[in-house]
Amino acid sequence: MSTAQVLLENFDIELPITRRLLERVPANPDYKPHEKSMPLGRLAVHVATLPALGTLILPTPECDAAKAKFPDPNFVSTEKLLADFDACSAETRIALANSSDADLAHLWKFSAGDFVFSNNSRSCTFQHMFFGHLSHHRAQLGVYLRLLNLPVPGLYGPSADEKPAAT
């Protein structure tokens, strides 16, 4: 199995899980559980557009965050959130499917001006910046839903909201 096939297998597991969570995001974009927390709408948009990292990492040798253009972080609606997620996911899936092991072994530099955050293989960078980053923010989003007393979908099995009542 190629590196791209392994990444795609994981991608195809994680994306539907993420979509189920995004489907539950309410139109309450300003909610913050703490003054230092990211507002719900911005967090949801960030999670929805994280798949776009693949179209940045896979075909390019580097990204300078000081010069890069990132998606608009403003929440419009849950429908737009899902449309953006689906579009970003489809583009990245194609980019992954078209990546060879040699492509994924190339170094990819992530910096902000002269400060270098990382300079690892595209495969490592994709796993870290996409899968790891996605899991982190998806967990945050689940906490926001819980604090708003909204049902949280099961991510890797049933959630407390999906378990049948004990008899």
Each PLM stretch: what is its role?
Residues 1-9:
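Short, charged, low-complexity loops and linkers
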Residues 3, 36, 74-81, 123:
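Residue-level recognition of alpha-helical structural elements
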Residues 8-23, 27-71, 110-167:
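Short, contiguous alpha-helical
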Residues 56, 61-101:
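Helix-adjacent hinge/juxtasegments
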Residues 87-103, 123, 158-167:
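Short flexible/disordered coil segments
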Residues 98-114:
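Acidic catalytic patch
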